[in-house]
């Protein structure tokens, strides 16, 4: 109902076609109808994104010239890496980014959530990873938070600072599902054995918490030795 210039209203058809790959689509704008053709849901999604991009700068009701677009990627892996370890990205902003990746037909999000500077993903049963590893601020011994780096303020309890924050298990599931609906694969990265200082310090804190109760359990996830 928002497209004219072709004996308004305009009908949109979805059509199957033989394609070069799973993302190959064809978009045809005719006098009184639009056809999006593809061999997979991903292809149809890409065609829809192109149609949306054509409409974005239009006023409503929009007018499109007749056009035929035959499009497919030469590179099947088109990715972006997002580093939320050094500076945290809130979930709402990440979802906006995923929408933009979909608009540009980027199909992989490399999710870098752990590094020396922070650990940003909740792991049930290993609370110190986020209780300590996701916060930076003033500290003498890093028993409650990590040293401040990549300026994010000095207060480990400031939830507005880019130094602090993490994704809960539920947050991460939501991100995965949100991306999947937009045909984006999320590849989470756990940095190891190098660039693992946040996890190392978090597991040292876990060790110190449990060593008086159960030494075997305390050492279970310890990532360092006392002589290191």
Locate each region found by the language model.
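Aromatic/hydrophobic pocket-lining residues that form the small-molecule binding cavity
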Residues: 44, 94, 168, 172
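Aromatic- and acidic-residue-enriched carbohydrate-binding clefts of CAZyme catalytic domains
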Residues: 117-181, 196-228
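Short, well-ordered coil/turn segments that N-cap beta-strands
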Residues: 75-78, 105-107, 180-184
């Amino acid at each position: 109902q928002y497209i004219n210039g072709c004996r308004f209203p305009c009908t949109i058809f979805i059509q199957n076609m033989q394609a070069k790959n799973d993302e190959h689509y064809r978009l045809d704008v005719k006098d009184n109808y639009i056809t999006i053709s593809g061999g997979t849901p991903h292809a149809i999604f890409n065609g829809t994104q192109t149609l949306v991009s054509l409409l974005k700068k239009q006023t409503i009701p929009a007018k499109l010239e007749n056009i035929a677009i035959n499009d497919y990627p030469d590179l099947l892996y088109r990715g972006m890496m997002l580093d939320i370890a050094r500076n945290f990205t809130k979930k709402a902003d990440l979802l906006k980014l995923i929408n933009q990746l979909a608009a540009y037909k980027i199909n992989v999000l490399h999710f870098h959530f752990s590094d020396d500077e922070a650990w940003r993903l909740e792991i049930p049963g290993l609370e110190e990873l986020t209780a300590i590893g996701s916060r930076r601020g003033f500290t003498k011994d890093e028993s409650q938070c990590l040293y401040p780096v990549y300026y994010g303020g000095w207060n480990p309890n400031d939830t507005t600072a880019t130094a602090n924050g993490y994704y809960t298990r539920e947050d991460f599931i939501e991100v995965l599902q949100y991306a999947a609906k937009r045909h984006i694969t999320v590849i989470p990265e756990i940095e190891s054995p190098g660039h693992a200082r946040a996890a190392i310090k978090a597991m040292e804190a876990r060790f110190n918490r449990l060593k008086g109760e159960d030494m075997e359990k305390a050492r279970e996830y310890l990532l360092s030795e006392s002589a290191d």
